[in-house]
């Protein structure tokens, strides 16, 4: 198998994966099942128990966020309810502990924000689900016109898909957003930071950025995004 060398070297007592056997995880979990090593999956996303719940390997245990997710696993994918444990959302513990939070002045300085203006943040979603640009442009015009009850500014967080050059709609909208930043005052874009290699740019793992944006925004606007759950 693909992971024979690792199993031979470490001889694990248990194998835990963040999916029930998608992509490369399926080979890891299949190898553990073949060797008779106990295994389990940890549900990490709000929609994983409903949209991606079919196992790609023989998985013994699952831990999920809530009673609703457990119901989705049991009724939607025939999991044995005795093998599904409700364990909360460990990946969000850092939000409650505030371990990722930057100081406000440091965050505002990072994005050239005005500390005296209210902050409206827009978290983009998949372009092919709903174009972001019409919403962003409307907000950009609004904060730049000073027609709101209080002086405000707009911070735009692009979606990881914006950094793909194919299909072209991703790159086109990315270009539109950066042009908008040049055109209007009080409009700022979270600058993309390369994650290294083929990993692309900021996505789900830039916790300092995400948690600070949500903590210091007066309003967060998004359409069909996991950011709704995190907010």
What are these regions (language model features)?
Residues 70, 104-105, 221:
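Catalytic cores of nucleotide-enabled group-transfer and carboxylate-activating enzymes in metabolic
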Residues 17, 64, 122, 156, ...:
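Redox-cofactor binding/interface segments in oxidoreductases and associated redox assembly factors
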Residues 1-99, 199, 209-212, 227-228:
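Active-site and donor-binding regions of nucleotide-sugar-utilizing enzymes
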Residues 13-14, 61, 119, 153, ...:
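Structural motif
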Residues 8-12, 113-115, 216:
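Glycine-rich phosphate-binding loop signature in dinucleotide/nucleotide-binding domains
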Residues 7-8, 168-229:
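Donor nucleotide-activated moiety binding/catalytic core segment of transferases
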Residues 18-19, 61, 130-133, 168, ...:
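Residue-level marker of alpha-helix boundaries and capping positions
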Residues 93-194:
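Conserved catalytic-core segment of nucleotide-activated headgroup transferases in glycan assembly
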